[in-house]
Amino acid sequence: MKRVLQIMGGLKRGGLETFAMNIYRSIDRSEIQFDFLLTQVAGGDYEEEAKSLGANIYYIPPRNKGYKAYHKALDDFFSKHHDYIAIHEHISSLTSIDPAYYAKKYGIPVRIFHSHSSSIQKSLRLHWVHTILHYLNKPKVHSYATHYLGCSDKALDWMYKYTGVRSKALMVNNGINCEQYAYNKIIRAEVRKEFGIGDADFVIGHVGRFIPLKNQVFLVDILSELHRSMSSAKLLLVGEGDTMDEIKTKVSDKGLEKSVIFTGVRSDVARLMQAMDIFVMPSWFEGLPVSIVEAQAAGLPVVASDTISYDSDLTGTILFKSIKDSAEDWSKCILEWKEKNGRPNNIEELKKAGFDSKTTVKQLVNIYIGNV
């Protein structure tokens, strides 16, 4: 049995965590098993599922709890656990690439950096320190890692430009189980009934962690503008996070409590997307979000900020809009874009584009076993 160590912050239901779990579910676990090395406390949404699939989950203290303790924990871990065929480090920046250093020290042959973002959150504490560290660590990339992956051209440029390895970096698609998202009228009716959504209601959908970069606060402004001409418009928000209370307060201040649905963290995103009429993502920046791939698989038209990678438009159903435009402009575009797009079946198109999880698994397995 070969084992691969997946390295990330935690196993909450976010984009990169969902990507890793999609791969884990689809990979032949009789041949390759995953373990997880995390820096966040136990209790992530995916932890029990990962354990049930055969994973060991290990925890080390995060770097912000003490630099020396962090490095000692990494050294101790890899001195005892160095029989992996590969480590797969999922990162949003190069601020913390030390696991790969210790993996190399203890002889793990395949060491992967995987870029899932295209910038650093400006709301992040000590943002400027993270940015400086990101660029200071670029000269180390070629010696720490053996493979350089990313979810989009923007994510690849952000992580590997000026490192000397950009030409070697590979795009790995955020593959999903496409059939699971295929439009189903029966499920749509069930979900709408569950949340008290009328047949004639117009539902704007969004899936994402409640953090500043996702910009859910702007979605509330958009809904407020839509209500000027369409009182039946509703906002379906899937996820939770640090800014959730702020969003709920804004919803209350605008008197939109009956028009905004907070589902919390859900494991049935494919099902919830059936109830939506359009998917909107006004993020300040992204790599290539898994949720945008999921929305296209569900046949939803998408309006997204132009800070998101244009690589994400796999079906010709995404309208990119400037994040600097007003909520009024966004609301008009949402209505116009919905009118121009029906509810197409995009499954085969996504598969041809290489966004089926089986295709992604094949690519990663070849990297894990050293064929690439």
Feature names for model-found ranges:
Residues 141-182:
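A short, active-site helix/loop in glycosyltransferases that binds the activated sugar's phosphate group
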Residues 243-246, 257-266, 272:
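Active-site donor-binding acidic/aromatic loop of nucleotide-activated sugar
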Residues 74, 182-197:
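A short helix/loop element that forms part of the nucleotide-sugar donor recognition site in Leloir-type
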Residues 37-38, 301-305:
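Short hydrophobic beta-strand element within catalytic cores of glycosyltransferases
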Residues 17-22, 202, 206-225, 242-248:
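A conserved mid-protein helix/loop that constitutes part of the nucleotide-sugar donor-binding site
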Residues 6-72, 242-244, 367:
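N-terminal strand-loop element at the rim of the active site
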Residues 92, 265, 284:
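Aromatic "clamp/platform" in nucleotide-sugar-dependent glycosyltransferases that forms part
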